[in-house]
Amino acid sequence: SLVGSEMCIRDRVKIYLGEAGGHGIDSGETAATIHCGSLGIIHGSRTLVMQDEDGQIIEPYSISAGLDYPGIGPLHANLAQEHRATVMAVNDEEALRAAYELTRLEGIIPALESAHALGMLPRMKFRKEDVVVLTVSGRGDKDLDTYLAHRYDENLE
């Protein structure tokens, strides 16, 4: 049955979401809405929102303009609420390091938004037989000014 096959897939397929941690989820400068938001309404959707006690929007922060948003899509909020997805807040530095590594190793310049997904990888453990699918969308060349302004030099560590 479809329900049975859906349960089989649910047991075998793990979903990980990377959200923009900015300077850290405790810094006050973050866009990690799943970690730091609360239930509210934004742009007609009831979802998690970065807001104060009165429901007023709190300005989020992320190095990525595309992730610098005070809400989260209802689908992602539901995946987190139902414990169907593991959500990690990826800070700016982690995203930049991951972007530089992908560029160095593969010659692919990821958009800053996708760099946050890449930034989760160092924290994760995989088995040799695991199949990992990670989407890299957008064009990193639009973010070159940001990458150059925050140049990561692996020799400084």
Named regions from a protein language model:
Residues P70, A111, K142-L144:
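Short, electropositive, low-hydrophobicity segments enriched in small/polar residues
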